[in-house]
Amino acid sequence: MVATPLPPTQSPRHPSLQELSLSELQTWLDELAERIITGETLDRATAIALTEIEGEEKILALCAAADRVRQACCGNTVDLCSIVNIKSGNCSENCSFCAQSAHHPGQDSPIYGMKTPEDILAQARAAAAAGAKRFCLVSQGRGPKYNSPKSTEFEQILATVRAIIAETNIKPCCALGEVTPEQAQALKEAGVSRYNHNLESSENFFPEVATTHSWRDRVETIKTLKAAGIQACTGGILGLGESWQDRVDLALALRELEVESVPLNLLNPRAGTLLGEQSKLDPFTALKAIAIFRLILPQQIIRYAGGREAVMGELQALGLKAGINAMLVGHYLTTMGQPPEQDHAMLAGLGLQGGEAPIPGEYVRASQVREL
């Protein structure tokens, strides 16, 4: 099916969405969800118009429309993954939010070299026991592309990936930074099927995030990985100080790149970083953003990532009714997550089940087969 853009929401005959009554807005959103489910794409003007929606009741109406799209396009399986910080601290990059950057001397993040394959394998087994289906090896630094010729770290990572495949039932992923085409191919051959490399924010806002590398550097890395046949796990962070236009433009860039998985981190400010005094997002602002991402990316895996506990608090479950269909379980890179048992109980209470969610197109194709 060839996707066609949705018509703009605003015209001389159509008021701002915020001017609609709740019932009028619900009707409009129901129609919007149905058009997206049947294959139309959300254009930028309509997405920007959705950002005008304010007030808890109206935001929940937006979430309900996004949840309808999620159910139709992705089903009720919530993709569960876990991560391990295999090398921490003293990072060369100056990302404003990150406690691992050597540019933020006031932070107190742990600093250690590459973990042993045995340590990583033990954590992979623990992640599998907690219900995770994927396990991502995350390392600080700009990436293996810039490793010293004498470094053996990349080869050690490849060996660890092979060991995880041989000795567990969990799928290994990596988040190592920039890679060459040859390194991407080596990761693919070792068994890495998905790689995390976030855009963090829009191209326009990115200079506020980091200046030691560019947004385009990140895009090129994603293209290199996809050219090697590796799925892209690519998203960003909400709450860096970006505008609503930046959030929409990030989602549109992810759609253009055809990424498979979209982790949405909610900034949990870390002391000693440039954003250490930044206010956390309001939970309903986060919900609105999640819902808009789902409407722009109807078939993508959209993942609750870092900061969900700190930002959403008791409203975490609402994210799973606003378009989220994946979660990172266990601990994060430098902060603690909630116990996996609590996550599984939350899913069960919503009638959802943890597992491995389909990549874009798979669930729709499966549904079409079932209807024949």
Swiss-Prot record:
UniProt-recorded Gene Ontology molecular function terms: 2 iron, 2 sulfur cluster binding; 4 iron, 4 sulfur cluster binding; biotin synthase activity; iron ion binding
Cofactor: [4Fe-4S] cluster; [2Fe-2S] cluster
Reaction it catalyzes: (4R,5S)-dethiobiotin + (sulfur carrier)-SH + 2 reduced [2Fe-2S]-[ferredoxin] + 2 S-adenosyl-L-methionine = (sulfur carrier)-H + biotin + 2 5'-deoxyadenosine + 2 L-methionine + 2 oxidized [2Fe-2S]-[ferredoxin]
Residues annotated to bind [4Fe-4S] cluster: C91, C95, C98
Annotated EC: 2.8.1.6
Residue positions binding [2Fe-2S] cluster: C136, C173, C233, R303
SUPFAM superfamilies found in the cross-reference section: Radical SAM enzymes (SSF102114)
Cofactor note: Binds 1 [4Fe-4S] cluster. The cluster is coordinated with 3 cysteines and an exchangeable S-adenosyl-L-methionine.
Gene3D superfamilies (alphabetical): Aldolase class I
Pathway(s) where this gene product acts: Cofactor biosynthesis; biotin biosynthesis; biotin from 7,8-diaminononanoate: step 2/2
Keywords, sorted A to Z: 2Fe-2S, 4Fe-4S, Biotin biosynthesis, Iron, Iron-sulfur, Metal-binding, S-adenosyl-L-methionine, Transferase
Domain Radical SAM core residue range list: 73-308
Similarity section: Belongs to the radical SAM superfamily. Biotin synthase family.
Function: Catalyzes the conversion of dethiobiotin (DTB) to biotin by the insertion of a sulfur atom into dethiobiotin via a radical-based mechanism.
Protein name, as recorded: Biotin synthase
Native organism: Cyanothece sp. (strain PCC 7425 / ATCC 29141)
Source species taxonomy: Bacteria, Bacillati, Cyanobacteriota, Cyanophyceae, Gomontiellales
Gene designation: bioB
